[in-house]
């Protein structure tokens, strides 16, 4: 077998693989809803203060390398989460201290988008925080990666772990 023929076989195999992944992604739903919950060792006021103060995220969210706080628009907090080379514009769309906070991805050019709804309930010795992600994944290949590699709830689980560590 010549090098050219071997190269063509490799390229054809990769093309078929990409086509299969894209086909599977097109069969997966664009939208999803995922929920995670945790009991945290702080009262609802302290938990709400931590999740609503996006300017302090970089100090305790180890998954972020920086947070760029932007000027509010229509009274809504806006910021950019920076993680390595990735930048995700965010905004708060609903704020009801200390019970509920809703944030959303504010960049329509990303292959994904959606909201996180934080619901806080007082509990014995702390707060029960529930995060509900209502997401959409526009790119079929990214749907496959999100569903089968990362999992829809991975970022929420990381957030809850970081918040728990921050609150002590």
Which residues make up each language-model segment?
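N-terminal Lys/Arg-rich, disordered targeting/topogenic segments
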Residues: 1-2
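Hydrophobic ligand-binding cavity/cleft-lining segments
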Residues: 5-71
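Short Gly/Pro-enriched turn/cap motifs at secondary-structure boundaries
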Residues: 27, 80-82, 107-109
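Short, surface-exposed coil-to-beta transition loops
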Residues: 33-35, 85-90, 112-117
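A short, structured loop/turn motif at beta-sheet edges
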Residues: 41-44, 93-99, 119-128, 165-168
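Extracytoplasmic/secreted envelope proteins and their assembly/folding machinery
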Residues: 44, 48-54, 67, 89, ...
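Extracytoplasmic/periplasmic/luminal assembly and interaction segments
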Residues: 53-104
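Beta-strand/loop substructures that line and gate deep hydrophobic ligand-binding cavities in soluble
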Residues: 105-158, 163-166
């Amino acid at each position: 077998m010549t090098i050219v023929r071997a190269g063509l076989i490799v390229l054809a195999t990769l093309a078929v693989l990409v086509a299969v992944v894209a086909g599977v992604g097109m069969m997966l739903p664009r939208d999803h809803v995922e929920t995670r919950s945790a009991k945290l060792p702080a009262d609802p006021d302290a938990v709400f203060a931590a999740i609503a103060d996006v300017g302090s995220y970089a100090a305790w969210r180890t998954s972020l390398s920086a947070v760029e706080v932007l000027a509010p628009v229509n009274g809504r907090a806006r910021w950019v989460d920076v993680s390595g080379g990735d930048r995700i514009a965010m905004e708060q769309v609903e704020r009801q201290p200390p019970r509920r906070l809703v944030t959303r991805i504010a960049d329509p050019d990303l292959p994904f988008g959606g909201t996180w709804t934080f619901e806080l309930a007082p509990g014995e010795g702390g707060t029960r925080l529930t995060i509900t992600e209502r997401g959409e994944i526009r790119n079929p290949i990214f749907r496959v990666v999100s569903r089968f590699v990362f999992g829809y709830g991975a970022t929420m689980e990381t957030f809850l772990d970081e918040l728990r560590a921050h609150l002590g």
